[in-house]
């Protein structure tokens, strides 16, 4: 893995952290309308992607392949919408850090399984004991982050 790819992944993560509270503020401006905020978020993203796609060219050739694709390949937009709607709704309920910690745990567990079995067209990358220990350490960190204060207070009061 090159350093540039690692830095890009870090920046993407920072952008995801900004996305949820920005979309939540938009929902508040729309009278707590989570769906409308998600819709506008996607409209802005769609407009941006349209400009990039047109600038890149080759759209007719790429679209010609669309009818032959299985339906599951079109689920990315649905999953993205579910993530955006869920994020907008959950940020004020559980907080941004808790939301993203749990999102990361969900992504980590599912990505380890997807990699291990080579699902949805991924190259098979077996789950090794080292990867498993790393995932457990990350998940333990999330548990401490979410419940550590309560655990400490319970230990102190006993």
Model-found features: residue ranges?
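Membrane-interface alpha-helices at helix entry/exit sites of multi-pass transporters
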Residues: 33-40
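Residue-level signature of transmembrane alpha-helical cores of multipass secondary-active transporters
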Residues: 8-10, 72-73, 100, 135, ...
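Membrane-interface interhelical linkers
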Residues: 1-11, 25-28, 35, 46-72, ...
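Structural motif at transmembrane-helix junctions in multi-pass transporters
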Residues: 32-33, 86-102
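C-terminal transmembrane-helix exit sites in multi-pass transporters
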Residues: 109-129
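Hydrophobic transmembrane alpha-helices of multi-pass small-molecule transport proteins
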Residues: 127-147
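Hydrophobic/aromatic residues within the transmembrane alpha-helices of Major Facilitator Superfamily
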Residues: 14-18, 47, 78, 82, ...
